[in-house]
Amino acid sequence: MLPAGSISSAYRKPHTGWQHRAVLNGGMTYNKYRTRARATTRRIRRITLGAGLLVVIAAVAAAPGFQSLASSTIHVLRSEHHDALGEALPSTVWPAQGQAAVQVGESQVQAGPNQHPAPIASVAKVMTAYLVLRDHPLGPDEDGPTITLTDADVADTDHRRGRQESVVSIAAGEQLTERQALQALLLPSANNIAAVLARWDAASVDRFVGRMNAAAQSLGMTHTRYTDPSGYDDPTVSTAADQVLLVDRAMRLPVFASIVATSSVTLPVAGTVRNTDGLLGHNGFVGVKTGSTDAAGGCFAFRAIRWIGGKHTTIAGVVLGQPGHDLVAAGLAAADAMVDRIASPARARAMPVLQP
């Protein structure tokens, strides 16, 4: 696993600075493009239509065949408009293995191949945090109510530690604020705190899991099934496309966005804990959540902000099932490479492309 705030040299990209000269595809400068377009417009304006021709056009337009053709033409124009502002991603964008999906700016979610329900590991904690904040909203400067940890919580933590799960140290009688519990959940990815939050929110883990599944259905996550609040259980499955829908919704919550953008925090008993997101602060990445198990592979739900088409553009995405010796690093590397390919200036068709 990468240390917090670091990233292996295998996938660290140098910062090249902002680019400044507008060039369209094919090497035509933006100014030359505008000059040619204006000349074409002037020629069109000189064309006049006779009254007889207008009558013919009106008659043809009324014909059923023409109406069908017009409908098809409108569809093509809309497709081209969408293509220019948020074009369909080429197959080279997606990771070679596993599955992935992204949403670029305000466009629709686009999914790569192999979209089938699969284990998502700790990416499931995004839903856990989303539900807790939905049920117990926090203001930007609020820490929220306190949660007192019990002997049962300590016993559960010891059991999970024995299974090599990701946990943070706790003590009976320790008090965590809601914000601190969410930080423990999302930064070091503490499975024991996922269970604590589930019981605090819904009185039992099973009831909380039921709420997770109800929320998934309400968000249109039709290929998602949660069986635990941490994602450690393999039967917790989803698709990358489903999880992108959740990332978008969760990042609308300022407290969630603030927590996942934090590199480390200090907890009462655990001390300093660090974010497992080694891409945080690099190449425009601003969060969200890593995950890894043998069954799930390397997983990463993320948001990045990159310079595309002459403006800062948000890229929200998820990669699942990435193979490698270090599964967390594999998920991070796949996301980093995918965002780089999406943000490549060569892909900004029909827009001024910024180049040095």
Each language-model region and where it sits:
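Terminal targeting segments of Actinobacterial cell-envelope proteins
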Residues: 11-47, 350-353
